């Protein structure tokens, strides 16, 4: 008998690091965690710091921190000053020159939050890919999460890149986002944009489908002799179905005349509708970045201008948009010193 004695192959530092990152622990780290955790920590830390202490007086002429009297709904990390252009505003860059106070004043926290937030979201998406691969799942969770990433990147990065500066991006705050929505409406007529319409249909349609699906499953749960309670009559290892797809199919067939007969197609549809809505709306935002126009019904505008008695909901909205522009241009860009005489301000035909 021959016995072969060999040395165990030495493992390099990469293999050791790979094992440590993928170790089973309470909070999985993984290779994606190298990107996710530092970026998420820094983005959230910058946002909390900005909303607590940093003023927007030097960038927007506004108070935007708890220290100045704002609350959770009105505090924000504001976008940089228009004069900063598309500079990344590094702390050590020519704008701040290593001065942290000056860096905060010119809007450095916004670029810091936006860029680290973007990479943090991408890291979270990669985390779902990585864990799905390790446990043998399909990557549809990560594919679905690409929708929110597309919206975030298009709104906070691509839109201002198409405009004059980061100044035109939304600031990170609740009321600040509302102001940005009014800006999109006034300057781009966003609500009449077909990509916005498809996005709304996708998001609200997804919410409707989610509600219908959850209610239908609850309605068709099988009763369990031991525990008929909705939340306890199920174990992950049970072999039988927990609800009746046949009953659900018959119910909706009677309601609408049609119903999903295939669970796979049903759940793919639940995935497809909202994710497509998110992607389409992000494409629309990229169009706005390039100043592409929405629907224009010029014939109605011309007729309304010539005939005082003719007005449509469209022409009224156009007048509202003009009012938003006239107000925002002066208020939101004080450095431009816009002055609008009374005769150019919009008025409806009824006035």
Curated annotation (Swiss-Prot):
The keyword Aminoacyl-tRNA synthetase does not apply. It comes from the Eukaryota. Pfam families: Photo_RC. It is a multi-pass membrane protein. One of its GO terms (cellular component) is photosystem II. CDD domains: Photosystem-II_D2. Pheophytin a binds at residues 128, 141. Fe cation binds at residues 213, 267. Signal peptide: none annotated. InterPro entries: D1/D2, Photo_II_D1/D2_sf, Photo_RC_L/M, Photo_RC_L/M_CS, PSII_PsbD/D2. GO terms for biological process: photosynthetic electron transport in photosystem II. Chlorophyll a PD2 binds at residue 196. Keywords: Chlorophyll, Chloroplast, Chromophore, Electron transport, Iron, Magnesium, Membrane, Metal-binding, Oxidoreductase, Photosynthesis, Photosystem II, Plastid, Thylakoid, Transmembrane, Transmembrane helix, Transport. The chain crosses the membrane at residues 39-59, 123-139, 151-164, 206-226, 277-293. It is an enzyme of class 1 (oxidoreductase). A plastoquinone binds at residues 213, 260. It catalyses: 2 a plastoquinone + 4 hnu + 2 H2O = 2 a plastoquinol + O2. Photosystem II (PSII) is a light-driven water:plastoquinone oxidoreductase that uses light energy to abstract electrons from H(2)O, generating O(2) and a proton gradient subsequently used for ATP formation. It consists of a core antenna complex that captures photons, and an electron transfer chain that converts photonic excitation into a charge separation. The D1/D2 (PsbA/PsbD) reaction center heterodimer binds P680, the primary electron donor of PSII as well as several subsequent electron acceptors. D2 is needed for assembly of a stable PSII complex. PANTHER family: PHOTOSYSTEM II D2 PROTEIN (PTHR33149:SF12), PHOTOSYSTEM II PROTEIN D1 (PTHR33149). 2 of the reaction center chlorophylls (ChlD1 and ChlD2) are entirely coordinated by water. Belongs to the reaction center PufL/M/PsbA/D family. This is Photosystem II D2 protein. It comes from Cyanidium caldarium (Red alga). The gene is psbD.
